């Protein structure tokens, strides 16, 4: 499962490829995750952040997300929100079956609602980074197709009126 964590040769491989692609990777682990090294000085192009670090800096997670060229997630709702930015998404699915059997999904076939690269191993991760580095976005059309199913899109004008109507205050 630990495609993004630091584990021996895979970590060396990942760091080298990130440098070759000119990518700076920020990894924010879930509060319930453990076992990742937060050795900030060990990497030149990877930083691990926690919710506590963001709070101490006065930064909201979504402020950081808005600056990102791409997002790698698993089954988190942040990926659904990130679709609104129309930027590349990658999904780490190394524990898909165990997640399905223990926690379950809202959708019967969740992969159909993941408009981005499916990452099962380091090679898939390398492909995702390579696409980001050269500006390729192979899932752009899939995101656009899924966007209306995942988000109620506002009108081009009349936002306030639509909101008032929705809230029954008009």
What do the predicted segments below correspond to?
Residues 63-76:
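Acidic donor-binding loop of glycosyltransferase active sites
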Residues 2-13:
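Single conserved hydrophobic/aromatic residue that forms the stacking wall/gate
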């Amino acid at each position: 499962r630990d495609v993004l964590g630091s584990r021996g040769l895979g970590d060396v491989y990942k760091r080298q490829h990130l440098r070759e692609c000119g990518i700076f990777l920020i990894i924010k682990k879930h509060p319930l995750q453990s076992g990742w090294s937060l050795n900030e000085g060990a990497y030149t192009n990877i930083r691990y952040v926690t919710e506590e670090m963001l709070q101490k800096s006065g930064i909201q997670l979504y402020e950081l997300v808005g600056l990102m060229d791409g997002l790698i997630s698993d089954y988190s709702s942040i990926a659904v929100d990130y679709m609104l930015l129309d930027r590349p998404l990658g999904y780490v699915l190394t524990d898909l079956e165990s997640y399905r059997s223990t926690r379950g999904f809202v959708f019967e076939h969740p992969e159909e609602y993941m408009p981005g690269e499916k990452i099962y191993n380091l090679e898939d991760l390398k492909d995702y980074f390579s696409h980001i580095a050269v500006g390729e976005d192979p899932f752009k059309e899939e995101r656009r197709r899924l966007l209306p199913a995942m988000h109620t899109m506002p009108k081009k004008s009349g936002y306030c009126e639509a909101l008032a109507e929705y809230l029954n205050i008009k």
